[in-house]
C-alpha cells in the first residue's frame, strides 16, 4: 500500500518573522504495491509565474510567497527529511518584469539554488519561443520532463525527456510530465517545430514502462493540463486518472486551483491522488508517503 498524507504550506509574512502554516487535509490509501515501509516527502509547486518577490498589497494572498521565503521553507523541510524530492508542474515563467527582462534566467537560477529535482513545462515557458527556452534550460540542474511534446529536431532535444527516475535510498520514483495542448495558448511560431501528442496515450505508455519495466515504487505525473473535467472535451487530470493505470499521484497546474486531496479511481479501481497549489507561489504542497 502507498499511504499518503497531504498538506499545504501557506507562506505568510508576519511582523517579525515568516510563519509556516501547515493544514492537514486527510489520510487515504493510493496504489497497491506491497513492500516494506519506506517514507518519502514530496514538495511541489506550480504556476509561480515569475513571482520572485512576495505578492503585493491588494492582491489575493498579499505578502505571501516569494523565492526567499520558499527557499527558507525548503531548507527547513530538508532538515526534517534530507531525502525529500522537489517538483514543479510548470508555468514558472511570465507574470512579472523579471521574466520580461531576463526571459526565465532568474527563475531557473533560483530553482537550481532551491534544489529542484524535476519540472514539466507550462504554456508560458514558450512565450519567447523554443530556442530561447532551450538556452535558458541549458543551465538547469534539474530534469525537465514532458512525455507528450515531441521535441525531436528542436533545440530542446536532449534537454526535455519523457521521464526521469529519482532514487532515494531503496526507493525508485518515476516522474513524467504532460503539457497542455498549445493550440490557442502558444503562438505557432513559438511552439514550432515541436509536436503535441495525445496525453492519455503518452501517459499510459510511460506509466507502464516506469511501473512494470523500470520497477518504480511510485509513479508521479507532473501535469500542466488542469485538474477538473470540463464540458469542452479539454484534457484534464481527472479524466487522465480515470482512463489510465499505474499512476499514483498527479501534481497539477495551469488552472490555478487549490486542489486539496482529490482522489479519483483509475481503470483498476485504485485511488490516484490529485493535487494543485493555486498560483503565484503563495503555497507549497507537501505529500508524505509511506510505501
Predicted regions and their residues:
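Acidic, metal/ion-coordinating pockets
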Residues: 32-291
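N-terminal amphipathic/basic-hydrophobic helices that include classical n-h-c signal peptides
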Residues: 1-11
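Leucine-biased recognition of intrinsically disordered, low-complexity hydrophobic segments
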Residues: 5, 20, 24-25
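Hydrophobic h-region of N-terminal signal peptides that target proteins for export
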Residues: 24-33
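Bacterial N-terminal signal peptides that target proteins for export
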Residues: 9-21
Amino acid at each position: 500500500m502507498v499511504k499518503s498524507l497531504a498538506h499545504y504550506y501557506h507562506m505568510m509574512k508576519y511582523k517579525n518573522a515568516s510563519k509556516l502554516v501547515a493544514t492537514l487535509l486527510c489520510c487515504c490509501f493510493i496504489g497497491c504495491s506491497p513492500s516494506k515501509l519506506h517514507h518519502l516527502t514530496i514538495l511541489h509547486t506550480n504556476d509561480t509565474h515569475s513571482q520572485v518577490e512576495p505578492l503585493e498589497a491588494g492582491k489575493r494572498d498579499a505578502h505571501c510567497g516569494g523565492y526567499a521565503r520558499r527557499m527558507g521553507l525548503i531548507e527547513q523541510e530538508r532538515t526534517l527529511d534530507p531525502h525529500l524530492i522537489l517538483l514543479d508542474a510548470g508555468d514558472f515563467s511570465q507574470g512579472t518584469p523579471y521574466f520580461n527582462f531576463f526571459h526565465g534566467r532568474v527563475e531557473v537560477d533560483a530553482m537550481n539554488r532551491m534544489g529542484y529535482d524535476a519540472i514539466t513545462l507550462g504554456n508560458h515557458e514558450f512565450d519567447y519561443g523554443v530556442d530561447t527556452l532551450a538556452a535558458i534550460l541549458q543551465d538547469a540542474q534539474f530534469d525537465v520532463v514532458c512525455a507528450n511534446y515531441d521535441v525531436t529536431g528542436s533545440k530542446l532535444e536532449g534537454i526535455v525527456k519523457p521521464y526521469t527516475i529519482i532514487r532515494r535510498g531503496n526507493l525508485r520514483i518515476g516522474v513524467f510530465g504532460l503539457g497542455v495542448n498549445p493550440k490557442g495558448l502558444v503562438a505557432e511560431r513559438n511552439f514550432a517545430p515541436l509536436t503535441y501528442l495525445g496525453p492519455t496515450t503518452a501517459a499510459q505508455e510511460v506509466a507502464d514502462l516506469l511501473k512494470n519495466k523500470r520497477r518504480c515504487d511510485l509513479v508521479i505525473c507532473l501535469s500542466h493540463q488542469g485538474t477538473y473535467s470540463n464540458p469542452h472535451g479539454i484534457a484534464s487530470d481527472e479524466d487522465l486518472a480515470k482512463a489510465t493505470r499505474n499512476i499514483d499521484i498527479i501534481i497539477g497546474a495551469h488552472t490555478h486551483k487549490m486542489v486539496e486531496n482529490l482522489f479519483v479511481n483509475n481503470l483498476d479501481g485504485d485511488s490516484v491522488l490529485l493535487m494543485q497549489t493555486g498560483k503565484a507561489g503563495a503555497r507549497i504542497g507537501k505529500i508524505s508517503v509511506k510505501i
